[in-house]
């Protein structure tokens, strides 16, 4: 797998700053696989004029700064980014990682009746379910910026539902 698209947006307080976003296409070093085209809907010609990987990573680092990362199933994305950063600059992301699915699980778990609160609680963690339960709009999935926006909206809503006054930016 290669990084072919990067999407990020900023959260300030309880607001999603959609004007402050990063949306990049990355020129892959290998052919874009049919599986990748099917998932991300980006063809070889769509990313042919993308940035070289190391330039895209530099822009991502500048955009992120020291802020925490918020996302849905971040482990995969962070592993891909860390691999690219290690190759380009010899470093990995030190930022705090905030996993939206874990926040959602904790929130839903507390809503279960006591007899259902056990280690194997049946809580649906699909992104579409999370967004629907939180009454948030579902945008086209597997689009880097859309995924970032939806994860940010879920993060903000979950923080509000948990009664947390300030949201990390």
List where the protein language model places each region.
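Metal-dependent phosphoesterase core characteristic of DEDDh/y 3'-5' exonuclease domains
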Residues: 2-4, 10-40, 62-169
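Metal-dependent phosphoesterase signature
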Residues: 38-56
